[in-house]
């Protein structure tokens, strides 16, 4: 085994910084928050696999791999013998890699732990990209809209920008091959490749179609954004990855330079990330020698403390943290620390509640095992697992911004009874249609609303909620969320 790390788990595919209405796939069911500028996928409840805290900098209580007792050794020998027998004596030729993976998957599944999993080499690569914020590609944010892959925006200074790619360019081919009917993640995979290799995109701009050659480079996706909104500085932290603490420090210094005293740290739908970054970020506001998080395993406890003085420019700032049910893991470590030390007031809705930590062990073949090893507590000893952190001031998220994605493989019609039908009703209500109930029943009244929606959006009027209707429905909800951030607006009004 190579490289032991402690983690509490995050699987964030950068996918050329891709966003998608329907086609962004994960390894499990997903819940989508229509937050401001994009779909942000999180995995909720017993199926969560994201929201990673990766404890790279801390070796917990000098953990050592202990020897096996006789029973364990006998069990291990049995597993080895079964593998050998099936690999050599089974009447049909077997793939040894698949047998090995099946055995590992079986052991991990037996844990009945949604945070523990075995990742293949390819999955490990995506996992590591999510932690580092680095990937090889062209640096273009994409989304699927009206069954077309459209460039939302090229990243500043990226190969895509230098090659002349513009917002709203529609990609029709990759390396001469049509992408019609492909899911967004499939297109992203085609666009990505090895560093310093070229990819040719055929893009449609208005009535013109042309080929654009772009050299792939290593791209770093920033995790922190700063905006000035009146007399309030809004710092959005999307995840905790390598150097998020440095990005946060820069944002705080910019706010100070702008003369702002009131700062909002927006952690909504932030699934977590590196624990050492969460500690460094807390250290911007909390003085040296203070406990940020406590790690516990059995009777053993270790307090992780700040190592530097707090940033002097941040000392006089009025800090507000904005969270929701998608704020998890390292987000909760950071929020819990600032809350316990009265360094920030927390607004929004209750956080996810993930208080356990995973360890990752990477193997020589590039695969990785991730398993729960310990739990964590806030400085005051609060264990938030399954409970979350309650805000000091509740600001509810509009229902439509917390809807489950409706599978576009399903069609709903009169007489159907399904939980997705409630989602349809909530969404239509948000789009201005008069919905008389939020039941799971597809009744005549809903059929009439669907017909009205289809007619208004120049779709075939069937009264059935089909794939085309679903795509337009999702697109309009995303646009609405992008234009109106009701929760943030309410908080800024409170701070005035």
From Swiss-Prot:
Swiss-Prot/TrEMBL keywords: Cell membrane, Hydrolase, Membrane, Protease, Serine protease, Transmembrane, Transmembrane helix
GO molecular function (one): endopeptidase activity
Enzyme's top EC category: hydrolase
Annotated region described as Disordered, given as residue ranges: 1-27
SUPFAM superfamilies: ClpP/crotonase, PDZ domain-like, PGBD-like
One of the protein's GO biological processes: proteolysis
Composition skew (Polar residues), residue ranges: 17-27
Cell compartments where the protein resides: Cell membrane
Segments of skewed composition (Basic and acidic residues): 1-16
Residues annotated as catalytic: 329 (charge relay system), 340 (charge relay system), 354 (charge relay system)
Membrane topology summary: Single-pass membrane protein
InterPro entries: ClpP/crotonase-like_dom_sf, CtpA/B_N, PDZ, PDZ_6, PDZ_sf, Peptidase_S41A, Peptidoglycan-bd-like, PGBD-like_sf
TM ranges: 39-59
Disulfide bonds: none
All residue ranges annotated as the PDZ domain in the record: 124-206
Enzyme nomenclature, EC number: 3.4.21.-
Gene Ontology CC, one term: plasma membrane
Gene3D superfamilies, per the entry: 2-enoyl-CoA Hydratase, Chain A, domain 1, 2.30.42.10, 3.30.750.44, PGBD-like superfamily/PGBD
Family membership: Belongs to the peptidase S41A family.
Protein name: Probable CtpA-like serine protease
UniProt organism field: Staphylococcus aureus (strain MRSA252)
């Amino acid at each position: 085994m190579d490289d032991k790390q402690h983690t509490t788990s995050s699987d964030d595919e950068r996918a050329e910084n891709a966003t998608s209405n329907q086609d962004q796939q994960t390894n499990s069911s997903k819940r989508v928050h229509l937050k401001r500028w994009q779909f942000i996928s999180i995995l909720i409840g017993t199926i969560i696999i994201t929201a990673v805290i990766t404890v790279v900098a801390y070796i917990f209580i000098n953990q050592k791999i202990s020897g096996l007792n006789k029973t364990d050794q006998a069990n291990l020998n049995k597993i080895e013998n079964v593998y050998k027998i099936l690999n050599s004596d089974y009447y049909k030729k077997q793939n040894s890699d698949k047998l090995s993976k099946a055995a590992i998957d079986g052991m991990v599944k037996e844990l009945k732990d949604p945070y523990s999993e075995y990742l293949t080499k390819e999955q490990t690569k995506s996992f590591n990209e999510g932690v580092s914020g680095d990937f090889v590609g062209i640096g273009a944010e994409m989304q699927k809209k009206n069954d077309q892959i459209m460039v939302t925006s090229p990243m500043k200074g990226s190969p895509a920008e230098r090659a002349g790619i513009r917002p709203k360019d529609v990609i029709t081919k990759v390396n001469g091959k049509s992408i019609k009917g492909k899911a967004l993640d499939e297109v992203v995979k085609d666009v990505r490749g090895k560093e310093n290799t070229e990819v040719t995109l055929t893009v449609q701009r208005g009535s013109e179609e042309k080929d654009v050659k772009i050299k792939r480079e290593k791209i770093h996706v920033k995790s922190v954004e700063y905006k000035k909104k009146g007399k309030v500085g809004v710092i959005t932290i999307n995840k905790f990855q390598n150097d998020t603490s440095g990005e946060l420090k820069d944002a705080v210094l910019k706010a100070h330079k702008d003369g702002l005293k009131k700062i909002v740290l927006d952690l909504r739908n932030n699934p977590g990330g590196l624990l050492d970054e969460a500690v460094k970020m807390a250290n911007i506001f909390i003085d040296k020698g203070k406990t940020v998080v406590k790690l516990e395993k059995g009777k053993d406890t270790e307090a992780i403390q700040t190592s530097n003085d707090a940033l002097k420019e941040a000392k006089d700032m009025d800090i507000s943290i904005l969270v929701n049910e998608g704020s998890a893991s390292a987000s909760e470590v950071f929020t819990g620390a600032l809350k316990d030390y009265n360094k920030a007031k927390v607004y929004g809705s209750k956080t996810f509640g993930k208080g356990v930590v995973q360890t990752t062990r990477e193997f020589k073949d590039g695969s990785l095992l991730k398993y729960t090893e310990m739990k964590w507590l806030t400085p005051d000893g609060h264990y938030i697992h399954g409970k979350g952190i309650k805000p000091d001031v509740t600001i509810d998220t509009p229902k439509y911004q917390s809807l489950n994605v409706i599978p576009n493989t399903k069609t709903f019609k009169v007489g159907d009874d399904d939980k997705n039908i409630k989602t349809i009703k909530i969404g239509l209500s948000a789009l201005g249609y008069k919905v008389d109930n939020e039941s799971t029943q597809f009744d005549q009244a809903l059929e009439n609303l669907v017909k009205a929606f289809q007619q208004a959006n120049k779709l075939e009027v069937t009264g059935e909620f089909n794939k085309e209707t679903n795509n337009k429905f999702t697109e309009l909800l995303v646009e609405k969320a992008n234009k109106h951030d009701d929760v943030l607006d309410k908080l800024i009004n409170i701070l005035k």
